Amino acid sequence: MKLLRFADILLIYAEAANMAGSGPTQLAVDRLNSIIDRANEGTGTEPRATLAMTQAQFDQKVIDERSFELCFENDRYFDVLRKRLLQEVNLPDNADGYDENDYLLPIPALDALSIGQNPGYE
């Protein structure tokens, strides 16, 4: 059973609010900053999110914060796949690097009978 921590819910909200519009909303910034402030105990050592950030900058800030906040909770792998970041965060294991098939997971066998299997898992 997957348990969600409140910090994860706030990060999901901040990311969704940012991606649903054309950039971060005040509420999304506040949610992200509440996690940053709690983690740093208000020391001001971590740069906070602002409304001046572009959508891409805020998205990167959320992804970075997810990697800090949720480390060792097995979420990073799926964030990397979802955001298509394999090439940026991993050293290439081979000279060819990664292709689009590396971002796909296998479809369960019973479902694959009716809808087919993802490339690379046939």
Where are these regions (language model features)?
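Acidic/polar-rich alpha-helix caps and helix-coil junctions
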Residues: 1-122
